[in-house]
Amino acid sequence: MSSTPKVLRGCCGIGLWALLLTPTWASWQDAVPGAQIIGTGDFSVFGFDVYNARLWSAARPLADGQPFALELIYRRSVSREDLVKASVDEIKRLAGSSISPAQLAVWQAQMQQSFVDVQAGTRITGVYLPGQGARFFVGQQLQHEINDPLFAQAFFNIWLDPRTRNPELRQQLLGTAKP
């Protein structure tokens, strides 16, 4: 008797387990149903384009308590370490002394797992889940989930807080920029 059917059963069983273990939020769009672009803008440093940002939400204008996604499409190479350092620096600047150094260290470790080295064309999407935390996707694949609502608020404040370093990009993302 041939062992092919047994091998096929084994492969099919593994495939079925993979499907069953795939989270229901396999893409960022699953976490933000009905998402539409609220706004888009470019971020540049010293005249060099770094990324194009897109803010997605089902609520327009963006509403408190609603999930949203911030999609960054990179236009140049940036290391994971540089992404994490820039994020930590901005969180620290915006939060001041309300975030302890120990908490920042925990968040820094979480961001190390959430981000990757990026090249031109790499797409990282952060999903804000009110009261839960954040999920980070590279392309359409979940990279890491952080179950910490305080982190999520502090992280997305980098772009959306009125004290952001780039108020023009904030207005573009929120769809409130004047033509």
Residue map of PLM features:
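Terminal leader/tail segments of proteins
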Residues: 25-179
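N-terminal compositionally biased, intrinsically disordered segments and leader/signal-like regions
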Residues: 5, 23-25
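Bacterial N-terminal signal peptides
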Residues: 11-23
